[in-house]
Amino acid sequence: MIKTKICGLTEVGQALATARTGADFAGVVFAESKRRITTEKALEIAEALKPLNPRPMLVGVFANQTAEEVNRIASVCRLDRVQLSGNESWEYCNQVNLPVIKVIHVAEGTTAELVIQEIQAGLKALKKTPVFLLDTHTKALFGGSGQSFDWQIVKQVSLKYPVMVAGGLNPENIQGFIKIAKPWGIDVASGVETDGIKDTAKIHLFIERVKDADGNRIC
């Protein structure tokens, strides 16, 4: 089954709606972003999700912050995983206590072979195998841009390594993306928003269409 992550949650109600869909990961942002929340709000979300069974794993999103700060916030907010969306080195990743989701930014002109080489370098350097997340490279943002990249890159990389993918995905294009790219996981933020706010109806529709496409594809 394709793993799903709804990212950039800012309210408890959004997190509970995400949990009801059966999403695997719920993301809260601590990096500079319009979706950034306080540690107090993140802890409130963690407490709301805690009694649910099953529940999505709570992921904190960081970018170019110190490892000490990441570990402190992860502990205070009772996170399950840490997503590193900046330019963090593999050595830095080894300093993070929780399991890591490491973003690989796919810029214009990047080839599948270059992405594969970066994944191989990470697997060689890291003490624990992370989840690799491919996302669109933009100058201004570390994610949540709503911009996509060449899906053929994902298709080629997925033949060798399981990867999660973000960038420009939404309920309208997700089934076509899955058919082409066959990813291990999918991450969405702006694609399930209306006027910059998480839309619970779009979250439900997105997950429903992922499950439908995943169930109908031939592996």
From Swiss-Prot:
What's a single GO BP term from this record?
A: L-tryptophan biosynthetic process
A Pfam family: PRAI
Q: Does the keyword Amino-acid biosynthesis apply?
A: yes
Domain of life the protein comes from = Bacteria
Question: Which reaction equations make up its catalytic activity?
Answer: N-(5-phospho-beta-D-ribosyl)anthranilate = 1-(2-carboxyphenylamino)-1-deoxy-D-ribulose 5-phosphate
| Record keywords | Amino-acid biosynthesis, Aromatic amino acid biosynthesis, Isomerase, Tryptophan biosynthesis
Tell me the pathway. Answer: Amino-acid biosynthesis; L-tryptophan biosynthesis; L-tryptophan from chorismate: step 3/5
- What this protein is called in its record is N-(5'-phosphoribosyl)anthranilate isomerase
Cite the source lineage.
Answer: Bacteria, Bacillati, Chloroflexota, Dehalococcoidia, Dehalococcoidales
Q: Which gene encodes it?
A: trpF
